[in-house]
Amino acid sequence: MAEPSNRYTLTAARAHGKPGREVRPASTTIDMHAHMVVDEAAALVAGHIPADPRVQFFPEETRILTRKQDEDRHRYHTDLDLRMSVMDEMGVDMQIISPAPPQCYYTVTPDLGVKVAAMVNDGVAAFCARRPDRLAALGTVPMQAGGAAAAEELARCMGKLGMKGVELLTHVGEKELSDPGFEVFWDKAEALGAVVMIHPNGFTEARRFGRFYFNNVIGNPFDTTMALHYLIFDGVLARHPKLKLIAVHGGGYLPAYSGRIDHAWGARSDSHGELKEAPTTYLKRVYFDTIVFTPHQLEALVSLFGPDHVMMGTDYPFDMGEYDPVGHIVGTKSLSPTAISAIAGGTAKALFGV
């Protein structure tokens, strides 16, 4: 086996012109999908996180690269000056920072989950407070402790900590985000005007996803796709019309094949549920990021949902991230200057209130 390697640079999925720092849209540029880690929280849960059963299906090269990424990118998560430098290189004026997905810690016990969520949130808020002109925060909530506990921490995030909302993983153990036990959380999120960003952390059914990093490459957008389906078909979006919901990585696979859910809704009673309108009616309320890597995918996303529902993201600082986010938008030739300004920052500015 050759020496395992991964790169944190311009995507191989498209050609590149001038980088984003040289080609500027009219708006402030906002990266609404970026991460950090809180070391104190990691120390608190050390020894309390169950072994990940998916790892048994991963080849040795994938295991090595996962460990390597954790080591290589740690300072990019935690070093403020380094983050500012990378943002400058990418032409990003502002970041909305959320915890790295593993720091949602849904697999620890409910009691520990409540404690560690608060610690993560305190850490993210303190980090962002050091540069409030360039950073804003999303937190996490202890979903495994139930909807009421999650709603309580959400209120603390939005109030005391001054966050803009929270990040949720795409499922909570064997429960979907649409589980009735979480309804009180969705009620609170809508009432507070909180932004809720759903983010995958690898696909649960890993047996067929082990090789070629497919657990992330295919699994991450697939898990987002499943989460969106449940949130729509179980009526969460119908019951909460003012909910501010983001689906990262361009919303997974659902936007590209959304006609199928409308067809099923019209064709079969078991796909109809209690929805009064076609499923894509609710999908059109969702916001998406630009992490789709190619101009034609971005064009399709904007064509379907409009520049007022698509926002620039990077997934900083991971290897599956977008390291020329402004260039991606500006280089998508079909987009008008007005659309470019909205996607690069205007839509996020309005949604997050920054």
Language-model features, listed with the residues they occupy:
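Active-site gating/metal-coordination segments in enzymes
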Residues: 93-234
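Active-site gating loops and adjacent loop-to-helix segments of metal-dependent hydrolytic enzymes
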Residues: 26, 35-77, 204-222, 261-283
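Hydrophobic faces of well-ordered beta-strands that scaffold small-molecule active sites
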Residues: 30-32, 95-97, 136-139, 166-168, ...
